[in-house]
């Protein structure tokens, strides 16, 4: 072979792979205006001692089953708008006439915001204003919140330790109490909770005809083993702990933010036991707050980061695997070897096909704050973090339509494919962790996200 021929071979062998030709483009984030008025001025430093005393008096009266109006008047007279966070906390528990109306008026007096006109509740617009303003709380606010919240659920006390990574301003009650049942306990919570489903039996796909082909499942694949979790069961339990392949998984489903995720619960330092995920009954900007039953460590459900407790101190971030939202019929075609959770969940329960009905038809029912206007609030997207750290959002309907038309969708070295009729993301080394969520949820955790557009 001539020297020229050798050189040509080397050049060709070392040439970079061609950049894939992807359809569409990405919309970058920009600053956007909100409908909220200017925030009220707030002082620095501690609360006035008189206001602190009035807060204490009001809390004592609530603990005793009353509501001391004079103490509320004294709080308003103090004129410190930072206390609006505490008033909003109380508005979650006192709604409608009586104390609820008094709290709404007090909030309006301190902040200048109008929140009483909302036909559903003054609580939601009140917190939305505070989030939009990013109004600071005072040092000690979390402990006052602790005094109120532990009246409702004493087990929440373990979450309110000092020096945690929880922004307590954003945490609110989700309307249920803590699920603290031991792993494998199938008894209902005596005081009401969202009960996790632990190690449910599964059946082969050809025995899963009890679930309609056009209904949604959340599909997970580990070690080439595929499992379908029916959406109607996930809407009831919102948390499943099980083993798939060689891995132990905790799979939360936040119905309020449209997001099912799968965490490797053995991905903790060796001094800790396998994490057992449970639903706390609390929310943060409409996203469920989950925790580890063994250590009472709070986790960020969207990121898997431990925010408190021993796992928070160890800076644990649980590893994730992808979850695909697909119809059952199409998932079976793509994964004929898939299994599906048994019809009764292994607990003898009958599940309605649509347990939540039209609950979310009118938008988020809990505070979320301002939402990036690039997409509608509850548009479903598949979110993924690119290899260069850039967050990406692929609107589900538009992306699926483009792929069905035979075009390619992706970003740099990532490509989106159909999986069933859901979406998965694949990189140079195989599948990349991705999951579906409502736009408001993905964008509030990843405000710098790029949005794909056809």
Task: Give names to the regions the model predicted.
Residues 1-9:
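Sec-dependent signal peptide recognition
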Residues 11-13:
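C-terminal motif of bacterial Sec signal peptides marking the signal peptidase cleavage site
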Residues 15-18:
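Bacterial signal peptide processing site
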Residues 20-64, 70, 84-454:
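Mid-to-C-terminal functional-domain signal that highlights helix-capping/loop sites
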């Amino acid at each position: 072979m001539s020297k020229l021929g050798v050189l040509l071979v080397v050049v060709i062998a070392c040439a970079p792979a061609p950049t894939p030709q992807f359809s569409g483009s990405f919309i970058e984030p920009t600053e956007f205006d909100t409908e909220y008025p200017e925030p009220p001025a707030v002082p620095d430093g501690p609360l006035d001692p008189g206001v602190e005393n009035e807060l204490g008096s009001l809390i004592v009266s609530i603990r005793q089953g009353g509501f001391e109006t004079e103490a509320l008047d004294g709080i308003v007279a103090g004129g410190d708008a930072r206390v609006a966070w505490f008033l909003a906390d109380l508005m979650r528990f006192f709604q409608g006439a009586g104390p609820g109306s008094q709290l709404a008026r007090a909030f309006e007096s301190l902040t200048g915001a109008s929140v009483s006109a909302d036909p559903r509740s003054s609580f939601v617009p009140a917190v939305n204003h505070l989030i939009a303003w990013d109004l600071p709380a005072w040092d000690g606010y979390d402990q006052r919140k602790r005094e109120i919240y532990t009246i409702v659920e004493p087990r929440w006390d373990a979450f309110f330790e000092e020096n945690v990574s929880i922004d307590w301003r954003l945490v609110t009650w989700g309307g249920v109490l803590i699920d603290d049942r031991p792993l494998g306990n199938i008894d209902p919570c005596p005081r009401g909770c969202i009960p996790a489903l632990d190690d449910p039996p599964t059946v082969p796909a050809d025995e899963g005809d009890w679930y309609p082909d056009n209904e949604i499942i959340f599909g997970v694949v580990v070690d080439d083993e595929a499992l379908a979790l029916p959406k109607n069961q996930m809407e009831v339990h919102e948390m499943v702990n099980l083993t798939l392949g060689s891995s132990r998984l905790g799979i939360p489903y936040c119905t309020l933010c449209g997001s099912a995720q799968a965490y490797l619960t053995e991905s903790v330092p060796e001094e800790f036991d396998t994490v057992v995920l449970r639903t706390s009954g609390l929310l943060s900007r409409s996203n469920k707050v989950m925790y580890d039953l063994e250590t009472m460590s709070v986790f960020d459900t969207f990121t898997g980061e431990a925010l408190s407790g021993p796992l928070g101190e160890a800076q644990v971030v649980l590893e994730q695997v992808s979850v695909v939202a697909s119809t059952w019929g199409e998932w079976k075609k793509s994964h004929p070897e898939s299994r599906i959770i048994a019809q009764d969940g292994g607990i003898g329960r009958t599940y309605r096909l649509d347990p939540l009905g039209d609950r979310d038809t009118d938008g988020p029912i809990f505070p979320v704050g301002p939402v990036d206007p690039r997409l509608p609030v509850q548009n479903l997207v598949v979110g993924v973090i690119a290899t260069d750290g850039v967050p990406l959002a692929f609107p589900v309907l538009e992306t699926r339509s483009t792929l069905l038309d035979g075009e390619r969708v992706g970003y740099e070295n990532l490509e989106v494919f159909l999986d069933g009729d859901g979406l998965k993301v694949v990189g140079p080394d195989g599948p990349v962790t991705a999951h579906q969520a409502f736009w408001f949820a993905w964008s509030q955790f990843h405000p710098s996200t790029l949005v794909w557009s056809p």
